[in-house]
Regions:
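N-terminal export signals
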Residues: 2, 28-49
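Extracellular ligand-binding/catalytic regions of CAZymes and related secreted enzymes
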Residues: 59-62, 89, 221-230, 237-294
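Catalytic beta-strand/loop cores that center a nucleophilic Ser/Cys/Thr
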Residues: 59-60, 88, 93, 167-239, ...
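Helical hinge/lid and interdomain linker segments adjacent to catalytic or ligand-binding clefts
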Residues: 24, 66, 75-149
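Residue-level signal for short, function-critical loop segments
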Residues: 68-71, 249
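C-terminal segment of N-terminal export signals and the immediately downstream linker at the start
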Residues: 3-5, 15-23, 45-68
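Short, solvent-exposed loop/turn elements at domain surfaces
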Residues: 71-77, 96, 220-223, 253-257
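A glycine-rich, often tryptophan-bearing local segment used as a flexible ligand/cofactor-contacting loop or short
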Residues: 121-190
Length: 294
Protein backbone atom coordinates (compact mmCIF):
# COMPACT_ATOMS: atom_id res chain seq x y z
CA UNK A 1 0.00 0.00 0.00
CA UNK A 2 1.34 3.45 -0.91
CA UNK A 3 0.52 6.66 0.88
CA UNK A 4 1.63 9.50 -1.38
CA UNK A 5 -0.48 12.38 -0.04
CA UNK A 6 0.30 14.33 3.11
CA UNK A 7 -3.35 14.07 4.17
CA UNK A 8 -3.30 10.28 3.89
CA UNK A 9 -0.15 10.06 5.99
CA UNK A 10 -1.69 12.31 8.64
CA UNK A 11 -4.75 10.06 8.83
CA UNK A 12 -2.61 6.95 9.12
CA UNK A 13 -0.78 8.18 12.20
CA UNK A 14 -3.69 9.95 13.92
CA UNK A 15 -4.70 6.94 15.99
CA UNK A 16 -1.15 6.26 17.12
CA UNK A 17 -0.50 9.76 18.43
CA UNK A 18 -3.90 11.19 19.38
CA UNK A 19 -3.64 10.17 23.03
CA UNK A 20 -0.01 11.12 23.53
CA UNK A 21 1.30 14.38 24.91
CA UNK A 22 2.56 15.44 21.49
CA UNK A 23 -0.48 16.28 19.34
CA UNK A 24 0.46 16.66 15.71
CA UNK A 25 -1.43 19.31 13.76
CA UNK A 26 -1.72 19.40 10.00
CA UNK A 27 0.63 22.37 9.86
CA UNK A 28 3.24 21.11 12.26
CA UNK A 29 3.41 17.35 12.02
CA UNK A 30 6.70 17.50 10.13
CA UNK A 31 8.30 19.76 12.73
CA UNK A 32 11.36 18.70 14.68
CA UNK A 33 9.33 18.55 17.86
CA UNK A 34 7.12 15.87 16.32
CA UNK A 35 9.88 13.95 14.58
CA UNK A 36 10.31 11.30 17.27
CA UNK A 37 6.60 10.54 17.41
CA UNK A 38 6.31 10.36 13.63
CA UNK A 39 9.30 8.05 13.42
CA UNK A 40 7.71 5.68 15.92
CA UNK A 41 4.37 5.74 14.12
CA UNK A 42 5.99 5.01 10.78
CA UNK A 43 8.07 2.03 11.94
CA UNK A 44 6.14 -0.44 9.73
CA UNK A 45 6.74 1.71 6.65
CA UNK A 46 9.63 2.41 4.29
CA UNK A 47 10.18 5.35 1.94
CA UNK A 48 10.13 4.62 -1.78
CA UNK A 49 10.27 7.26 -4.55
CA UNK A 50 8.88 9.92 -2.27
CA UNK A 51 5.99 7.81 -1.01
CA UNK A 52 5.35 5.67 2.03
CA UNK A 53 5.02 1.97 1.28
CA UNK A 54 3.67 -0.59 3.72
CA UNK A 55 5.65 -3.80 3.77
CA UNK A 56 4.24 -7.31 3.70
CA UNK A 57 0.50 -6.71 3.80
CA UNK A 58 -1.38 -9.92 4.65
CA UNK A 59 -3.70 -9.08 1.74
CA UNK A 60 -0.92 -9.22 -0.84
CA UNK A 61 -1.98 -11.75 -3.47
CA UNK A 62 -5.11 -12.81 -1.59
CA UNK A 63 -8.27 -13.55 -3.57
CA UNK A 64 -11.27 -11.77 -2.12
CA UNK A 65 -14.98 -12.01 -2.95
CA UNK A 66 -16.85 -8.82 -1.97
CA UNK A 67 -20.62 -9.37 -1.97
CA UNK A 68 -22.88 -6.37 -1.43
CA UNK A 69 -26.60 -5.65 -1.62
CA UNK A 70 -29.68 -5.93 0.56
CA UNK A 71 -31.12 -2.87 2.28
CA UNK A 72 -29.52 0.24 0.82
CA UNK A 73 -29.98 2.31 3.99
CA UNK A 74 -26.65 0.94 5.21
CA UNK A 75 -24.96 2.37 2.11
CA UNK A 76 -23.32 -0.84 0.90
CA UNK A 77 -22.29 0.85 -2.35
CA UNK A 78 -20.47 3.67 -0.55
CA UNK A 79 -18.82 1.21 1.81
CA UNK A 80 -17.76 -0.87 -1.18
CA UNK A 81 -16.06 2.22 -2.54
CA UNK A 82 -14.10 2.59 0.70
CA UNK A 83 -12.88 -0.97 1.12
CA UNK A 84 -12.46 -2.40 -2.37
CA UNK A 85 -9.90 0.23 -3.51
CA UNK A 86 -8.09 -0.12 -0.19
CA UNK A 87 -7.82 -3.92 -0.50
CA UNK A 88 -6.61 -3.58 -4.06
CA UNK A 89 -4.01 -1.06 -2.92
CA UNK A 90 -2.76 -3.71 -0.48
CA UNK A 91 -2.34 -6.19 -3.32
CA UNK A 92 -5.56 -8.19 -3.02
CA UNK A 93 -7.35 -9.51 -6.10
CA UNK A 94 -10.96 -8.51 -5.48
CA UNK A 95 -14.05 -9.80 -7.25
CA UNK A 96 -17.16 -7.68 -6.59
CA UNK A 97 -20.65 -9.15 -6.85
CA UNK A 98 -24.18 -7.77 -6.36
CA UNK A 99 -25.79 -11.20 -6.13
CA UNK A 100 -25.80 -13.98 -3.55
CA UNK A 101 -25.46 -16.39 -6.46
CA UNK A 102 -21.77 -15.55 -6.20
CA UNK A 103 -21.64 -18.13 -3.42
CA UNK A 104 -22.78 -20.81 -5.88
CA UNK A 105 -20.18 -19.85 -8.46
CA UNK A 106 -17.13 -19.30 -6.25
CA UNK A 107 -14.27 -21.80 -6.10
CA UNK A 108 -13.53 -22.16 -2.40
CA UNK A 109 -10.16 -23.72 -3.15
CA UNK A 110 -9.10 -20.56 -4.98
CA UNK A 111 -10.60 -18.09 -2.50
CA UNK A 112 -9.08 -16.65 0.67
CA UNK A 113 -11.66 -14.21 1.99
CA UNK A 114 -15.32 -13.25 1.69
CA UNK A 115 -16.56 -9.82 2.67
CA UNK A 116 -20.32 -9.52 2.84
CA UNK A 117 -22.37 -6.38 3.32
CA UNK A 118 -25.96 -7.50 2.81
CA UNK A 119 -28.51 -6.30 5.35
CA UNK A 120 -31.77 -8.27 5.63
CA UNK A 121 -33.01 -9.99 2.50
CA UNK A 122 -33.22 -13.71 1.91
CA UNK A 123 -30.67 -16.35 1.05
CA UNK A 124 -31.59 -19.66 -0.55
CA UNK A 125 -30.65 -22.96 1.01
CA UNK A 126 -28.11 -23.67 -1.72
CA UNK A 127 -26.53 -20.24 -1.38
CA UNK A 128 -26.30 -20.55 2.40
CA UNK A 129 -24.86 -24.05 2.25
CA UNK A 130 -22.21 -22.97 -0.24
CA UNK A 131 -21.23 -20.01 1.94
CA UNK A 132 -21.05 -21.98 5.18
CA UNK A 133 -19.21 -24.86 3.52
CA UNK A 134 -16.54 -22.50 2.16
CA UNK A 135 -15.95 -20.89 5.56
CA UNK A 136 -15.92 -24.23 7.36
CA UNK A 137 -13.22 -25.38 4.94
CA UNK A 138 -11.00 -22.38 5.65
CA UNK A 139 -12.16 -19.35 3.70
CA UNK A 140 -12.23 -16.33 6.03
CA UNK A 141 -15.15 -13.95 6.29
CA UNK A 142 -15.32 -10.38 7.56
CA UNK A 143 -18.05 -7.77 7.75
CA UNK A 144 -19.70 -5.09 9.81
CA UNK A 145 -22.95 -3.79 11.24
CA UNK A 146 -26.12 -5.18 9.63
CA UNK A 147 -24.24 -6.26 6.53
CA UNK A 148 -23.01 -9.33 8.38
CA UNK A 149 -24.82 -9.21 11.74
CA UNK A 150 -28.38 -8.68 10.46
CA UNK A 151 -28.34 -10.33 7.06
CA UNK A 152 -30.73 -13.27 7.01
CA UNK A 153 -33.02 -13.22 10.03
CA UNK A 154 -34.61 -16.60 9.34
CA UNK A 155 -31.32 -18.46 8.92
CA UNK A 156 -30.04 -19.67 12.27
CA UNK A 157 -27.21 -21.71 10.73
CA UNK A 158 -25.88 -18.49 9.21
CA UNK A 159 -26.17 -16.72 12.58
CA UNK A 160 -24.31 -19.61 14.23
CA UNK A 161 -21.43 -18.92 11.84
CA UNK A 162 -21.37 -15.16 12.49
CA UNK A 163 -21.53 -15.55 16.25
CA UNK A 164 -24.25 -12.99 16.86
CA UNK A 165 -27.41 -11.34 15.60
CA UNK A 166 -28.68 -7.76 15.89
CA UNK A 167 -31.92 -7.39 17.84
CA UNK A 168 -32.21 -3.66 18.69
CA UNK A 169 -30.59 -0.22 18.56
CA UNK A 170 -32.36 1.67 21.37
CA UNK A 171 -32.65 5.38 20.65
CA UNK A 172 -31.62 5.07 17.01
CA UNK A 173 -28.61 7.23 16.16
CA UNK A 174 -27.11 8.33 19.48
CA UNK A 175 -23.78 9.18 21.10
CA UNK A 176 -22.06 6.23 22.75
CA UNK A 177 -18.62 5.02 23.71
CA UNK A 178 -16.70 1.99 22.49
CA UNK A 179 -14.36 0.40 25.03
CA UNK A 180 -11.32 -1.59 23.93
CA UNK A 181 -11.17 -4.64 26.21
CA UNK A 182 -8.31 -6.60 24.62
CA UNK A 183 -5.16 -4.53 24.27
CA UNK A 184 -2.96 -7.48 23.31
CA UNK A 185 -4.81 -8.69 20.23
CA UNK A 186 -3.30 -7.32 16.99
CA UNK A 187 -6.70 -6.05 15.84
CA UNK A 188 -7.07 -3.66 18.77
CA UNK A 189 -3.49 -3.27 19.97
CA UNK A 190 -2.50 0.37 20.45
CA UNK A 191 -6.07 1.66 20.25
CA UNK A 192 -7.90 3.52 23.02
CA UNK A 193 -11.59 3.88 23.84
CA UNK A 194 -13.44 6.13 21.41
CA UNK A 195 -16.81 7.75 20.78
CA UNK A 196 -19.37 7.11 18.06
CA UNK A 197 -22.49 8.97 16.91
CA UNK A 198 -24.39 6.14 15.28
CA UNK A 199 -26.58 3.15 16.07
CA UNK A 200 -25.53 1.34 19.22
CA UNK A 201 -26.17 -2.31 18.41
CA UNK A 202 -27.73 -4.49 21.09
CA UNK A 203 -26.92 -8.04 19.97
CA UNK A 204 -27.47 -11.63 20.97
CA UNK A 205 -23.96 -13.07 20.99
CA UNK A 206 -22.27 -16.48 21.07
CA UNK A 207 -20.53 -16.71 24.48
CA UNK A 208 -17.42 -18.21 22.90
CA UNK A 209 -16.47 -15.37 20.57
CA UNK A 210 -13.24 -13.55 21.43
CA UNK A 211 -14.46 -10.09 22.39
CA UNK A 212 -12.14 -7.22 21.48
CA UNK A 213 -14.36 -4.20 22.18
CA UNK A 214 -17.63 -3.55 24.01
CA UNK A 215 -20.17 -0.82 24.68
CA UNK A 216 -22.30 -0.12 27.76
CA UNK A 217 -25.98 0.76 27.38
CA UNK A 218 -27.72 3.46 29.39
CA UNK A 219 -31.27 3.23 30.69
CA UNK A 220 -32.41 6.29 28.72
CA UNK A 221 -34.12 4.46 25.88
CA UNK A 222 -34.84 1.08 27.50
CA UNK A 223 -34.55 1.24 31.26
CA UNK A 224 -34.27 -2.53 31.79
CA UNK A 225 -30.96 -2.72 29.88
CA UNK A 226 -29.18 0.09 31.71
CA UNK A 227 -25.62 -0.99 32.51
CA UNK A 228 -25.65 -3.94 30.11
CA UNK A 229 -22.32 -4.51 28.35
CA UNK A 230 -22.57 -5.83 24.79
CA UNK A 231 -19.73 -6.86 22.45
CA UNK A 232 -18.99 -4.49 19.56
CA UNK A 233 -16.03 -6.24 17.92
CA UNK A 234 -15.22 -9.93 17.95
CA UNK A 235 -13.38 -12.71 16.21
CA UNK A 236 -14.23 -16.39 16.17
CA UNK A 237 -13.80 -19.67 14.37
CA UNK A 238 -16.27 -21.54 12.21
CA UNK A 239 -14.73 -24.88 11.33
CA UNK A 240 -11.38 -23.96 9.80
CA UNK A 241 -12.47 -20.45 8.85
CA UNK A 242 -11.80 -17.17 10.60
CA UNK A 243 -14.79 -14.91 11.24
CA UNK A 244 -14.41 -11.20 12.04
CA UNK A 245 -17.29 -8.91 12.97
CA UNK A 246 -17.70 -5.28 14.03
CA UNK A 247 -21.08 -3.72 14.77
CA UNK A 248 -19.74 -0.30 13.74
CA UNK A 249 -20.49 1.11 10.30
CA UNK A 250 -24.19 2.00 10.14
CA UNK A 251 -23.37 4.32 7.23
CA UNK A 252 -20.17 4.96 5.33
CA UNK A 253 -19.47 8.18 7.27
CA UNK A 254 -18.99 6.09 10.43
CA UNK A 255 -15.66 5.04 8.96
CA UNK A 256 -14.52 8.65 9.21
CA UNK A 257 -13.85 7.73 12.84
CA UNK A 258 -10.22 6.59 12.58
CA UNK A 259 -10.54 3.79 15.12
CA UNK A 260 -13.64 2.33 13.45
CA UNK A 261 -11.87 2.25 10.10
CA UNK A 262 -8.63 0.84 11.49
CA UNK A 263 -10.40 -1.93 13.40
CA UNK A 264 -12.23 -3.00 10.25
CA UNK A 265 -9.07 -2.98 8.16
CA UNK A 266 -7.18 -5.02 10.72
CA UNK A 267 -10.06 -7.48 11.01
CA UNK A 268 -10.13 -7.95 7.25
CA UNK A 269 -6.40 -8.63 7.19
CA UNK A 270 -6.73 -11.14 10.03
CA UNK A 271 -9.63 -13.02 8.42
CA UNK A 272 -7.72 -13.27 5.13
CA UNK A 273 -5.13 -15.55 6.77
CA UNK A 274 -7.41 -18.51 7.58
CA UNK A 275 -5.60 -20.82 5.20
CA UNK A 276 -2.11 -19.62 6.08
CA UNK A 277 -1.91 -19.48 9.87
CA UNK A 278 -2.98 -21.93 12.59
CA UNK A 279 -6.33 -21.34 14.19
CA UNK A 280 -6.14 -19.50 17.49
CA UNK A 281 -7.20 -21.57 20.48
CA UNK A 282 -9.48 -19.91 22.99
CA UNK A 283 -12.45 -20.90 25.05
CA UNK A 284 -14.51 -18.39 26.99
CA UNK A 285 -17.27 -20.37 28.73
CA UNK A 286 -18.82 -17.29 30.30
CA UNK A 287 -21.70 -19.20 31.89
CA UNK A 288 -19.58 -21.98 33.40
CA UNK A 289 -19.71 -20.73 36.99
CA UNK A 290 -23.28 -19.46 37.09
CA UNK A 291 -24.58 -22.42 39.08
CA UNK A 292 -21.81 -21.95 41.64
CA UNK A 293 -22.64 -18.37 42.49
CA UNK A 294 -23.98 -17.63 45.92
Amino acid sequence: MKICRLEDLYTKITILVKNRIIMISRRSFLSKAAAATVATALTPYVFSRGCIKKNNSPLEGKKVLFVWGGWMGHEPDKCRDIFVPWMESEGAKVTVSETLDAYLKMDKKQLDLIIQIWTMGQITGDQENALLDAISDGVGIAGWHGGLGDSFRNNVAYQFMVGGQWVAHPGGVIDYRVNIVDHDDPITMGLSDFDMHSEQYFMHVDPNVKVLATTTFSDEHADWIGGNVIPVVWKKAYGKGRVFYSSLGHVSADFNVPEALEIQKRGIRWASLSKYEPMEDWKQPVYADWGKRG
